[in-house]
Regions:
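Histidine phosphotransfer helical core of two-component systems
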Residues: 1-47
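Short conserved segment of the HATPase_c
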Residues: 160-172
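Detector for a conserved hydrophobic position within an alpha-helical segment of the HATPase_c
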Residues: 194-195
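A conserved beta-strand-to-alpha-helix junction within the catalytic ATP-binding
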Residues: 39, 71-86, 138
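Short beta-strand-loop-beta element adjacent to the nucleotide/active-site pocket used for signaling
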Residues: 137, 141-151
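Acidic ATP/Mg2+-coordinating residue in the GHKL
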Residues: 155
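Short helix-loop "hinge" at the ATP-lid/N-box region of the Bergerat-fold HATPase_c
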Residues: 125-126
């Protein structure tokens, strides 16, 4: 019996040793896997954090812009659009695109808002050009009856599907191929700014044929005094 017990004990000890070695091997594999995946995980966390920071900053920008006092002044819109076109010249030159700024009517409105609106739309036009053909962006406009001004930013880029014509102006919405940086805030910000100036924004577009954004503003912005309704 003693020999049998000793044999059983030996087998138990051998199994315990084997299990321990197997556990150590598994632990080593886990540690190795964690070490291999750690840089990717950290990179993902960092990218997610940076994206969240950009979203928060953009939302704060929307909020601040909504509270900023508007300061109407007479604006040379031709000069403004030309300066914006110059600011993206390195991008258009690199892609073989061109921006044509036609003579634009003056307007009495808020300079900061108008620069942000036109700048954002021109930036978008450059960003979403179709690299399969020479890019063309045309900025035009005219006075219209009733004291209104219309401006157009037209391009021959990728275009926008009809189902997305309204959705692109919603917060965090983007359309088409997602191969350009952005969080879907630009056009929501533009529409908010246009409305603050008493204007409207619409888009005419077809996939593969380009887009035209139409801006309509009162020729003269009237800013209400605090507590005074217009």
């Amino acid at each position: 019996r003693k020999l049998v017990w000793q044999g059983d004990r030996s087998r138990v000890v051998d199994k315990a040793i084997a299990d321990a070695e197997k556990t150590r091997a598994v632990d080593a594999d886990v540690v190795m896997a964690v070490r291999e995946d750690m840089p990717e995980a950290i990179g993902f966390i960092r990218a997610s954090t940076e994206k969240m920071d950009r979203l928060i900053n953009a939302i704060l920008k929307l909020s601040r812009e909504g509270r900023r006092n508007l300061l109407p002044e007479t604006l040379d819109m031709t000069a403004m659009a030309e300066n914006i076109a110059k600011s993206v010249h390195h991008q258009t030159e690199a892609s073989g695109a061109r921006i044509e700024v036609q003579p634009l009517p003056e307007i009495e409105s808020d300079r900061i808002s108008m620069e942000q609106i036109v700048g954002n739309l021109i930036d978008n036009a450059v960003k979403y050009l179709d690299h399969g053909r020479p890019g063309e962006i045309v900025v035009s406009g005219e006075d219209t009856p009733g004291g209104w001004v219309v401006y157009r930013i037209a391009d021959n880029g990728r275009g926008i599907a009809p189902r997305d014509h309204e959705r692109i102006f919603e917060l965090f919405r983007r359309s088409g191929k997602q191969d350009r940086s952005g969080e879907g805030l630009g056009l929501a910000f533009v529409r908010n700014s246009v409305r603050r100036l008493g204007g409207t924004i619409d888009v005419e577009s077809e996939l593969g044929k380009g887009s035209t954004f139409l801006l309509k503003f009162p020729k003269r912005l009237i800013v209400a005094e605090p507590g005074v309704a217009l």
